[in-house]
């Protein structure tokens, strides 16, 4: 005897199938949205970077993907706000990378104290 609040196996399986289908659809929509955003970003980068600078950025992306993502976003923001000359050449990109490198550089001081072992 089933109670009004309980589900039988078929209803439960149908609920699970619907939930799984909804989740799959959500994941697919998220993937499409990310692909569209990436396509838009690549399109903007093609406009604001020379081919040589784009190649350098691609090489950076292979080695440091998170850094490259951050750099792409910064370059797009600078270009859209008009704070940088377009197109950005490879030399200008090198200068930007050098500035970022100097900002992130940390000086470490290592002190070695001698201990008398007895």
Curated annotation (Swiss-Prot):
Belongs to the PDCD5 family. The keyword Protein transport does not apply. PANTHER family: PROGRAMMED CELL DEATH PROTEIN 5. It comes from Saccharolobus solfataricus (strain ATCC 35092 / DSM 1617 / JCM 11322 / P2). InterPro entries: DNA_bind_arc (IPR022889), PDCD5-like (IPR002836), PDCD5-like_sf (IPR036883). One of its GO terms (cellular component) is cytosol. This is DNA-binding protein SSO0352. GO terms for molecular function: DNA binding. Keywords: DNA-binding. It comes from the Archaea. The keyword Transmembrane does not apply.
